[in-house]
Amino acid sequence: MTFFKHKTSIIDKNCKIGKNTKIWHWTHISKNSIIGFNCNIGQNVFIGENVTIGNNVKIQNNVSIYEGVTIESNVFCGPSVVFTNVKYPVSTKKVLKKNYEKTLVQKGATLGANCTIICGNKIGKESIIGAGSVVTKKVNDFAVVIGNPAKQVGKIINGKKKNTI
């Protein structure tokens, strides 16, 4: 094994975990998921079936990533970030996996603590989602968004945030 797995974590069958990745306490990685190298998966994280996570990704504690989510390399997910995969869940109906909506988090994005990412959206590369934001639509590359619903308030230019409001 070329990665670290805490004894309380669970990794289901057919998962691929990259070299030097660390998986901490009470984390569950569901079947057929792929996690790249040099990742840090915090405590009490749930990763659903068929999720793909790139290299050098940091996922803080209490994050939920459901089937249909792809996270590219160099992404930061703050504590308690939640991804959804069904826009209108109903307890009395079974949702078929073919109806899951896909979410893509592109390279270098930062998701602040307690963000909720509604399914079917793309989070642009190098974008920043402020803590507590609820993302209900596409986030452009290099955008800074905050709020509920999240709205663009700035842009990253030459590595620095510039306000647009």
Residue ranges and their predicted role:
Residues 1-7, 23-123, 149, 154-162:
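Flexible, glycine/small-residue-enriched loop-and-beta-strand segment within the central core
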Residues 16, 40, 110, 118, ...:
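Short glycine/serine/threonine-biased micro-segments
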Residues 19:
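Glycine/alanine-rich phosphate-binding loops at beta-alpha junctions
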Residues 123-138, 144:
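C-terminal/domain-terminus segments
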Residues 140, 165:
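Compact Cys/His-rich metal-coordination microdomains
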Residues 141, 148-149:
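Acidic, glycine-centered active-site loop in nucleotide-sugar glycosyltransferases
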